[in-house]
Curated annotation (Swiss-Prot):
Listed GO MF terms: riboflavin synthase activity
Organism annotation: Chlamydia pneumoniae (Chlamydophila pneumoniae)
Domain of life: Bacteria
Purpose of the protein: Catalyzes the dismutation of two molecules of 6,7-dimethyl-8-ribityllumazine, resulting in the formation of riboflavin and 5-amino-6-(D-ribitylamino)uracil.
Enzyme Commission no: 2.5.1.9
Name of this protein: Riboflavin synthase
Length: 200
């Protein structure tokens, strides 16, 4: 599990196709990398990946085709920056909201207006979004400001823009989206109840 509070930025330093998947290497600070060991979970732009190897400043992962199909990781290239968060340990504080690192899909930035970012996603995504509700964008825990049929927006404080990759994003770029799991469970449960009663 993760908290949605980005601990460090990383830079893609290795990117190589492996069958239908890929091998991904990321360079970061020794402060972030040193505590990690092979087998640890790390959220890379919000995607939970398992560490396959590491050294003093680099961490490596294998990314399977299913992950590439529903995230932006396959679009990364060497020198691209990514958000990093190590998995929570017992007793760690949760500064954002609980995340699994299982990305629901992607959304496109279609408008940036000062500190307000507007995104376009699928209608399937929108059914789980509510104003003032939680959302994770590239692994960052954020609060939804507005929600329409297939668009939504968030407001970003200067600290978030400075410490994450969102401050460098441009209109037209895609981001990874994880919806709040408790909200998804409630919505899906209500839909099943309505469907079984013939009221859907």
């Amino acid at each position: 599990m993760f908290s949605g509070i980005i601990q460090e930025l990383g830079e893609v330093c290795f990117f190589e196709a492996q069958g239908n998947g890929l091998s991904l290497g990321i360079k970061s600070t020794p402060l972030f990398v040193t505590p990690l060991v092979t087998g640890d979970s790390v959220a890379v732009d919000g995607v939970c990946l398992t560490l396959t190897s590491c050294n003093e400043s680099k961490i490596f992962f294998d990314v399977i085709p299913e992950t590439l199909a529903c995230t932006t990781l396959g679009e990364k290239r060497c020198s691209d920056q990514v958000n990093l968060e190590a998995a929570l340990k017992m007793g760690d504080s949760i500064g954002g909201h609980l995340l699994s690192g299982h990305v629901f899909g992607t959304a496109e930035i279609f408008l940036i207006k000062e500190n307000r970012y507007y995104f376009r996603g699928s209608k399937e995504l929108s059914q789980y979004l509510f104003e003032k509700g939680f959302i994770a964008i590239d692994g960052i825990s954020l609060t939804l400001v507005s929600v329409d049929s297939d668009t939504f927006s968030v407001g970003l404080i200067p600290e978030t823009l400075q410490r994450t990759t969102l401050g460098k994003k441009r209109e037209g770029e895609r981001v990874n989206i994880e919806i709040d799991m408790s909200t998804k469970i409630q919505v899906d449960t209500v839909k099943r109840i309505l469907a079984s009663s013939g009221k859907d």
